[in-house]
Amino acid sequence: MKLAIGRLLSPLFLKNPQKPLIITKRFYSTPGERRIKDILTEKLSPSSLRVIDVSGGCGSMYQVAIKSKAFQGKNTLAQHRLVNSILKEEIRNMHGLNLSTEVEDDISAGGSTTSS
């Protein structure tokens, strides 16, 4: 059956019909992503929040991009420290956290977006 599907799709979608078609985009959240989203939403009421488990689903590395009014008046380091303190318990079980923060109303400077 896999060969039949491969042959059927090969003219349109596959460069090499001998290799299987692999879909890599996830359309679901991991439990860790949901937990981090819930915590940050409750504490910071962000206007924009994206949490991605970049460890392949094992929950050891996350990428977080957050935009919130709670960051007003804080420099980038203070913004990151705030997020780190909120996620203190979760961070203990992580290998790493890639964090990007932005002030919600800072239109002129384009926000305070950085990665660490």
Swiss-Prot record:
The keyword Mitochondrion applies. It holds the Pfam family BolA. It is found in: Mitochondrion. InterPro entries: BolA (IPR002634), BolA-like_sf (IPR036065), Mt_Fe-S_assembly_factor (IPR052275). Disulfide bonds: none annotated. It comes from the Eukaryota. Keywords: Mitochondrion. The keyword Transferase does not apply. GO terms for cellular component: mitochondrial matrix; mitochondrion. Belongs to the BolA/IbaG family. This is Uncharacterized bolA-like protein C4B3.11c. It comes from Schizosaccharomyces pombe (strain 972 / ATCC 24843) (Fission yeast).
